[in-house]
């Protein structure tokens, strides 16, 4: 999917870029049976307090229900009926129509087009877009939408342009190199989808103006040094100051280089190599 630029008729258009959406199917509304209403929480938790700052507003969205597991359709071929936009995630989504008449959305892999036939299951061919257990995928292949627990559905590598690589297979576990650089052992019966996630140009888009961030539900980010001392550890001072200490969060946690992962976490034994920092 290409990048669209604009003539600078206004200052806000000078650096703004958007995706061209050439790959999307024309005239396709989302399938009503696979969508549901989505209430914006504006960063509030169940008690009404702000738990995630700088969230709120934005365009109303309907949630598209994505089949991350594809386990109950083993051995049933499906035709790609449409490639659609999803406002809730960075990649596009593909509408699959199975031979038994059922319809499902999946994350659209790079290179999958309308009319392609996809399949899931241990006997599915090695083809981009097919979902297989990790033990059935050859070493060196790129995968995405990887399960961590059998039957829970894909949890890893679901963002636009992302992919992991099968590094080795030994016993009950397959070693996978994740986009972060981490090498992790995953149980061989877990499912993964072959290929890369599509819409790889998403990372090259320039928002260009503050208003578009508001359309996306992102509110302004105020610097700590611009606040009062009661609001932030960097606040206060006469005139413009640098904060006077190493960068920290509003609650005093160091912002740079501070390790937040729990010591002796249960999943440490599955990590062969830590991620690239």
Curated annotation (Swiss-Prot):
Coiled-coil positions: none
Region (Disordered): 32-58, 225-277
One cellular-component annotation, GO: large ribosomal subunit
Keywords on record: Ribonucleoprotein, Ribosomal protein, RNA-binding, rRNA-binding
Molecular function terms, GO-annotated: rRNA binding; structural constituent of ribosome; transferase activity
PROSITE patterns linked: RIBOSOMAL_L2
InterPro entries: NA-bd_OB-fold, Rib_uL2_dom2, Ribosomal_uL2, Ribosomal_uL2_bac/org-type, Ribosomal_uL2_C, Ribosomal_uL2_CS, Ribosomal_uL2_dom3, Ribosomal_uL2_RNA-bd_dom
Protein's UniProt keywords contain Ribosomal protein: yes
Gene Ontology process terms (BP): cytoplasmic translation
Sequence similarity: Belongs to the universal ribosomal protein uL2 family.
Assembly: Part of the 50S ribosomal subunit. Forms a bridge to the 30S subunit in the 70S ribosome.
Stated role: One of the primary rRNA binding proteins. Required for association of the 30S and 50S subunits to form the 70S ribosome, for tRNA binding and peptide bond formation. It has been suggested to have peptidyltransferase activity; this is somewhat controversial. Makes several contacts with the 16S rRNA in the 70S ribosome.
Protein name in UniProt: Large ribosomal subunit protein uL2
Source species: Borrelia duttonii (strain Ly)
Gene: rplB
